Amino acid sequence: MPSEIVDRKRKSRGTRDVAEILRQWREYNEQIEAESCIDGGGPKSIRKPPPKGSRKGCMKGKGGPENGICDYRGVRQRRWGKWVAEIREPDGGARLWLGTFSSSYEAALAYDEAAKAIYGQSARLNLPEITNRSSSTAATATVSGSVTAFSDESEVCAREDTNASSGFGQVKLEDCSDEYVLLDSSQCIKEELKGKEEVREEHNLAVGFGIGQDSKRETLDAWLMGNGNEQEPLEFGVDETFDINELLGILNDNNVSGQETMQYQVDRHPNFSYQTQFPNSNLLGSLNPMEIAQPGVDYGCPYVQPSDMENYGIDLDHRRFNDLDIQDLDFGGDKDVHGST
């Protein structure tokens, strides 16, 4: 009996692409939510949430070693340790294969993304906090990207409108022809700034040559005498005023007397007789040597003038003091000059 070869058909998972199916469900749910918001109410539930079902993944004793402790919805472990995620379409639809993953956590995230796309806000999620956070981040990035694109387009449009309206000016050529030259607004701004810089340089040169001193002097006179703005002129009393000529004369007298004193000290010659009598006087440093009075020198002391003594009736006989010895003087003690008793 010839053996019959039975061809087993490999189980087909469908000809449709899973990513395309999820995209169609996501667009459908977004359209339903937008229509419910336009009607005046808040976002309404699109359909009934999926049944809770079993969270064990597969029958007891089947699958991998950690399959019995897995609590994620739509996730199960194979015998060789890999994790898979599956989800079923609403109303008893086909089962969608989401892929094979190395951990149950990654498989749970894949199931949550598919559930959000198919069931919308009524989806039952394994990790709602993480899934909602990632969805809000993606939505924010999408909105910011659209806003950036819109701002770029508006900037381009505004720039084109500016160039068309007032950015360029037409200047006729000097050869009296009908040709015109377009000037950019930036060139006009540069020319205006250049003119302002030239005016500023001319002003600085005028101030440097003293042209602006008259205006400053007129301003000071107007401030002192009153500039007509209901301001009374400044008044100073007699005690507060002074004569400038008198002040200059006092300063000149002081300078002349100081110069004469300094000149006398500079022109004075050192006394060499004092240096011969006191050779150690150079050790004093900056001290000037004392001069010994000469017989013919008059220092202007009135109490030593002989003429004044004669006028006052004082007769000074120098001969009485010629034979006088120092020992004959009595200073009120028994000691002599040398300290002996």
Swiss-Prot record:
Belongs to the AP2/ERF transcription factor family. ERF subfamily. PANTHER family: DEHYDRATION-RESPONSIVE ELEMENT-BINDING PROTEIN 2A-RELATED, DEHYDRATION-RESPONSIVE ELEMENT-BINDING PROTEIN 2C. It is found in: Nucleus. Residues 71-128 bind DNA. Pfam families: AP2. Transcriptional activator that binds specifically to the DNA sequence 5'-[AG]CCGAC-3'. Binding to the C-repeat/DRE element mediates high salinity- and abscisic acid-inducible transcription. The keyword Nucleus applies. Induction: By high-salt stress and abscisic acid (ABA) treatment. Gene3D superfamilies: AP2/ERF domain. One of its GO terms (biological process) is heat acclimation. The keyword Nucleus applies. Residues 45-59 have a biased composition (Basic residues). This is Dehydration-responsive element-binding protein 2C. A motif (Nuclear localization signal) lies at residues 8-48. It comes from the Eukaryota. The lineage of its organism: Eukaryota, Viridiplantae, Streptophyta, Embryophyta, Tracheophyta.
